């Protein structure tokens, strides 16, 4: 491509293009498509102005070869192709002499006949898309836009094409020739695909008042004014290559930019080790609910009353016993804890009036489970600073874990529909302005797609548990309070339903700092036999506590009911975020909106209705080993929501690091996919940064395996 550009274009144009690229730190040898695009644009600007003059009478005339003495003035001032400082100087002087409004961005030409700036566009895509992008970018009625394409189409503001037919035909013919020349050398496809949308660089904000004074005060030494400094920055000529810049910074740094090819990326290395285990604060797909429909009992809405009434709906309780002990814990204590909960609930029932909250007796099993008196005693530093061998505890490296299949199943389940609705329509907030008519239409469509989703159940369950736990932590700091895990929903028929998942007992909670930990024991009902995937339940002690009759196609069957018990902990900041899990709805709604926006801008009308109602169309959801998975728009909504919810449920430093670092690699691979010929340095360092986050977290490991699927398909 580089050779082609040097043969095909006038050397002056090539030189200007090289200068322009170096000014932005780009290398014409690497970004060859961009090099070709800049040359083409320059040539079109020059052809646009060629042979057009204004005579003594101020009339516009075309002179191809004439009397050199005629008093002619060029009709167009060429701004494109000058260095930025000079270009702005020209623009400013035109504005001062003609009174035309100063543009925010550098235009390409000025037309002395029509007295307007002109923005020229040359596009490899459809002219109307590019026209819209230009118009959106410059947002000025005054600048005239004229777009040409390589297929001979053109589009201009108000269909006013400025030039005569013949001059425009010359430009179109030249563009068509360039296209054919490229195609004959096999360069056209890559060039056509490499076009990016408009980028906004040249914004000029007028700064006045206090801000202006602050700006003047904070200039680097030797600059008298902001204009002065701006002109210096605009005119600053970097040498164009990152290598040069880096070598100025440090003697030790040497960066060679390596081309990133389809053969370059390798898959991420996932850790070996025992399979990873469940670490969410509450059970997800394995949870079991005891429910009451149309609750109307006394004290309905008071958690303890609701819980007792849910417990009464079940008749299959039996003597509990341990069927999957916890590897490290004192398992009989977990058993005694459950027995204590049952006994204390029974005591409440026997009282005349049921209290609103229940504080558990501080038995030895509860003290053990909640880590009471386990924290090492804090000693004032003053008292021990003279101790000679004072040192911090050695902490063990976390043990590596391998990806287990259960986390993908958890995710699939989170995307499914349940038979209840978990949010009302107004869960996402109300309209304020008329513009929001479209917004509320989108919101209603979106809510309809996700209101029955299991991920939405997890949101409401998370909000409830975190709110209750934070409340109790502040209101009953010293008490071992019993907190029921409750959610509310509506059945298909619109009947209200209250669900009990189990109980939490919180430990002492004198939470001064955001990160101070409150311990709690969770006890959750389930029908999942832990012996099927013992590695998933490593952190739990599981009891069998009853038998449940289930209606199936073949009649009633009895299934053992289990109780998953574990010690866990959380902090004020984690509970605060847990209480705000509804934000996941908003995040995924915004992702869907940007998809609708993209469609709408192509079709030039709002596509919300078509988007949600065209049931036949499928959309990309994600990548699996089989390739790109597609599904209905509802499935896309639910998948995006589930991702957002899992990011919240499985939030961790490993996830933060993985998301930030893998995104860099993702962008490089996408650039490769778009034939933008990306280059990298220290790719090994990037891989290291990503892989140091792959330790033992199930959600991070799953994301890494998805990333590998994406890599495989992206570089094919």
Swiss-Prot record:
Checking InterPro entries in the record gives: INFV_PA, PA/PA-X, PA/PA-X_sf
* EC number(s) stated in the UniProt entry for this protein: 3.1.-.-
Q: GO MF terms on file? A: endonuclease activity; metal ion binding; RNA binding
State the family named in the UniProt similarity comment for this chain.
Belongs to the influenza viruses PA family.
Record's function text: Plays an essential role in viral RNA transcription and replication by forming the heterotrimeric polymerase complex together with PB1 and PB2 subunits. The complex transcribes viral mRNAs by using a unique mechanism called cap-snatching. It consists in the hijacking and cleavage of host capped pre-mRNAs. These short capped RNAs are then used as primers for viral mRNAs. The PB2 subunit is responsible for the binding of the 5' cap of cellular pre-mRNAs which are subsequently cleaved after 10-13 nucleotides by the PA subunit that carries the endonuclease activity.
Q: Outline the subunit composition.
A: Influenza RNA polymerase is composed of three subunits: PB1, PB2 and PA. Interacts (via C-terminus) with PB1 (via N-terminus).
Can you say what this protein is called?
Answer: Polymerase acidic protein
Native species: Influenza A virus (strain A/Ruddy Turnstone/New Jersey/47/1985 H4N6)
């Amino acid at each position: 491509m580089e050779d082609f550009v040097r043969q095909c274009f006038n050397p002056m144009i090539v030189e200007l293009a090289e200068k322009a690229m170096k000014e932005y730190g780009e290398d014409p040898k690497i970004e060859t498509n961009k090099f070709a695009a800049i040359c083409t644009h320059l040539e079109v600007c020059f052809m646009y102005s060629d042979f057009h003059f204004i005579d003594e009478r101020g009339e516009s005339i075309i002179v191809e070869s004439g009397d050199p003495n005629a008093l002619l003035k060029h009709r167009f001032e060429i701004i494109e192709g000058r260095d930025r400082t000079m270009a702005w100087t020209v623009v400013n002087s035109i504005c001062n002499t003609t009174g035309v409004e100063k543009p925010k961005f550098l235009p390409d030409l000025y037309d002395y006949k029509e007295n307007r700036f002109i923005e020229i566009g040359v596009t490899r895509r459809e002219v109307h898309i590019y026209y819209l992008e230009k118009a959106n970018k410059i947002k000025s009625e005054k600048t005239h836009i004229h777009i040409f394409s390589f297929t001979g189409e053109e589009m201009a503001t108000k269909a006013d094409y400025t030039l005569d037919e013949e001059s425009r035909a010359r430009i179109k013919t030249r563009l068509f020739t360039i296209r054919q020349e490229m195609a004959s050398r096999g360069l056209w496809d890559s060039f056509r695909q490499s076009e990016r949308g408009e980028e906004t660089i040249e914004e000029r904000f007028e700064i006045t008042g206090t801000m202006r004074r602050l700006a003047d005060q904070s200039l680097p030494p030797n600059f008298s004014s902001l204009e002065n400094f701006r002109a210096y920055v605009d005119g600053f000529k970097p040498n164009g290559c990152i290598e040069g810049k880096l070598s100025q910074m440090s003697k030790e740094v040497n960066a060679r930019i390596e081309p990133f090819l389809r053969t370059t990326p390798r898959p991420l290395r996932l850790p070996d080790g025992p399979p990873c285990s469940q670490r969410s604060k509450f059970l997800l797909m394995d949870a079991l609910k005891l429910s009451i429909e149309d609750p109307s009992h006394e004290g309905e809405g008071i958690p303890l009353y609701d819980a007792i009434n849910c417990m009464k709906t079940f008749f299959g309780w039996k003597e509990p016993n341990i069927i999957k002990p916890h590897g490290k814990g004192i398992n009989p204590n977990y058993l005694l804890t459950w027995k204590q909960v049952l006994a204390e609930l029974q005591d409440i029932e026997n009282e005349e009036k049921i209290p609103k909250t229940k504080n558990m007796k501080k038995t030895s099993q509860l003290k053990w489970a909640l880590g009471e008196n386990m924290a090492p005693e804090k000693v004032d530093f003053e008292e021990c600073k003279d101790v000679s061998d004072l040192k911090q505890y050695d902490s063990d490296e976390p043990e590596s874990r391998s990806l287990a299949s259960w986390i993908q199943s958890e995710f699939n389940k989170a995307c499914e529909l349940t038979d209840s609705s978990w949010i009302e329509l107004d869960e996402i907030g109300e309209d304020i302005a008329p513009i929001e008519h479209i917004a509320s239409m989108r919101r209603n469509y979106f809510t309809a797609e996700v209101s029955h989703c299991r991920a939405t159940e997890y949101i409401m369950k998370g909000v409830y548990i975190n709110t209750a736990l934070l409340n109790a932590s502040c209101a009953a700091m010293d008490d071992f309070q019993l907190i029921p895990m409750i959610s509310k929903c509506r059945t298909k028929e619109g009947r209200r339903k209250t669900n009990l998942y189990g109980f939490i007992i919180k430990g002492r909670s004198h939470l001064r700092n955001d990160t101070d930990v409150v311990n709690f024991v969770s006890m959750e009902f389930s029908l999942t036999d832990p012996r099927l995937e013992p590695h998933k339940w490593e952190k739990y002690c599981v009891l069998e506590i009853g038998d449940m009759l289930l209606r199936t196609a073949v009649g009633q069957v009895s299934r053992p009911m289990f109780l998953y018990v574990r010690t866990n902990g959380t902090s004020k900041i984690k509970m605060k975020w847990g209480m705000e899990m509804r934000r996941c709805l908003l995040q995924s709604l915004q992702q869907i909106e940007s998809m609708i926006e993209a469609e709408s801008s192509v079709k030039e009308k709002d596509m919300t209705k078509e988007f949600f109602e065209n049931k036949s169309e499928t959309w990309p959801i994600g990548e699996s080993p089989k390739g790109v998975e597609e599904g209905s728009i509802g499935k896309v909504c639910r998948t995006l929501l589930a991702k957002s919810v899992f990011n919240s449920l499985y939030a961790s430093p490993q996830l933060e690091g993985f998301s930030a670092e893998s995104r860099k690699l993702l962008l490089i691979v996408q650039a490769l996919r778009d034939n933008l010929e990306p280059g990298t340095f220290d790719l090994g360092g990037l891989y290291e940064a990503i892989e140091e986050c792959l330790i033992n977290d199930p959600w991070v490991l799953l994301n890494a395996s998805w990333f590998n699927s994406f890599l495989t398909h992206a570089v094919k």
